Amino acid sequence: MSAKQLMFNENARHALLEGVNKVANTVKITLGPKGRNVVLDKAGGPVVTNDGVTIAKEIELKDKFENVGAKLIKEVASKTQDTTGDGTTTATVLAQAMITEGIKNITAGANPIEIKKGILKAVDAAVASIKAKSIEVKDKETINRIAIISANNDEEIGNLISEAMDRVGYNGVITVENSKTLETTLEHVEGMQFDRGYISPYMVTDQERRVVEFEEPYILITDRKISSLKTLIPVLEMIAQSGKPLLIIADDVDGEAQTALILNIIRGAIKVCAVKAPEFGDVRKEVLQDIAILTGGTVISEERNLAIEDVTLDMLGQARTVKVDQDKTTIVGGKGKKSDIDTRKKLIESQLNITEKKYDKTTLQNRLAKLSGGVAVIKAGAATETEVKEKKMRIDDALNATKAAVEEGYVAGGGVTLFRAIKALESMKADPEQMIGVNIVKRALEEPLRQIADNAGREGAEVIAMIKSNASETYGYNAKTDTYEDLLQAGVLDPTKVVRSGLQNAASIAGMLLSTEAVVVDFDEEKDKTSAAIII
């Protein structure tokens, strides 16, 4: 085991604070509509961004003790990103304010454990106040405003996101891809799409576009591997008599079965395309069942004691059209019963409500969306690769913030809801040392508003005084227009979940850091300084 450096008490906390400040001071200049950009020097070329978590993740400090502080503040941004996908800069600003004030008080002799308790109590009260002011999202215009603000006031992005949600529904899947043109566009994929293409280019029906397109096809759905021609003959004879095309979704189609299919296609005897089943393991079984219900077919599986030789026409699914390229399959207008599809959706929704794992949630959301309203794809276009990357980040931020607003509602933005939450702490009672923690949170709740004003070229203290003079809960400073007004009416909105999560994550990390008495890092005899540290 390598030698270690140890640092204790005040020295340790101040080293951590240095690291926190270096990250937070870099990130907080991006806050608000007039926040600045930061250029990141990356291997693929420089990236210009104002996304807090992206900036924070890039920072590594030379001093190992300071770097521990940097990692802790980065954790605030990462946790907020994981929870809501936005609000990372606000969370970082809140954490820095709590840590700075907390260390001042601990240095003066206050008990860090009691301060931590006070901080957590105050944050609980502030969160209750924020939730009480939350307004449910009910219209497209609100979604549009939230998306625009989260995309750094880009109206084009806001309009695309609100249109995408309008098309696929609030639970619909919206993805972001690179555009092959300079334009940023929205594409709506109706029906169900999954990431599996044709197993052989011989199956292509449109050679110029390299796609398979079938109208009114039958669909064979199975989790079995098809290798034997004998297995397929009864199905192919039925299809030939029907005169309709066939899409096969199977674990795989290989050997003489694949050869026979290709020969029949070349001869013009039948129209057929085979694709591998999407997903893996238990998820594959569920997705195949989704496809079967959507198309009115039956999954031919060992579990059901069904063999491919026993398939009848009524076991095959049907759809209006099917399109297959080398990467994906799209089924449009599945002919399953609406009642069966609705029952399936309710089952997935109930599973979504009880599952806690992020991967399982994402999988269930994707399945529900494909059964509900298809998939919307926002294609980010710009003149250079750097601009495309930056635009994709803004679209992702706006998309995540909008989804958060749909989930928990929205509040007045511009830092004013956090600022007004101070009122909820005025009447709090606690032990004297816990009250220090409460006062730390009071001071921290001003900081996002102060920083937004500073970034807009205004004096933070002056802006705070002006807002205090008006009793309205939603009256605040609109940095975009440089005016004081009712921010709800002006459309300056923040998702409740983003505001709440940022505050809770900031308090969690601040409490952890303030109650730290020692820091242990690796020691390199040639590189490391030894001042204020003990080497073991």
Curated annotation (Swiss-Prot):
Forms a cylinder of 14 subunits composed of two heptameric rings stacked back-to-back. Interacts with the co-chaperonin GroES. Together with its co-chaperonin GroES, plays an essential role in assisting protein folding. The GroEL-GroES system forms a nano-cage that allows encapsulation of the non-native substrate proteins and provides a physical environment optimized to promote and accelerate protein folding. It catalyses: ATP + H2O + a folded polypeptide = ADP + phosphate + an unfolded polypeptide. This is Chaperonin GroEL. GO terms for biological process: protein refolding. GO terms for molecular function: ATP binding; ATP-dependent protein folding chaperone; isomerase activity; unfolded protein binding. It holds the Pfam family Cpn60_TCP1. PANTHER family: 60 KDA HEAT SHOCK PROTEIN, MITOCHONDRIAL (PTHR45633). It is an enzyme of class 5 (isomerase). ATP binds at T30, L31, G32, P33, D86, G87, T88, T89, T90, G414, D494. GO terms for cellular component: cytoplasm. Its EC number is 5.6.1.7. Coiled coil: none annotated. Belongs to the chaperonin (HSP60) family. The gene is groEL. InterPro entries: Chaperonin_Cpn60_CS, Cpn60/GroEL, Cpn60/GroEL/TCP-1, GroEL-like_apical_dom_sf, GROEL-like_equatorial_sf, TCP-1-like_intermed_sf. The lineage of its organism: Archaea, Methanobacteriati, Methanobacteriota, Stenosarchaea group, Methanomicrobia. Keywords: ATP-binding, Chaperone, Cytoplasm, Isomerase, Nucleotide-binding. HAMAP family: CH60 (MF_00600). It comes from the Archaea. It is found in: Cytoplasm.
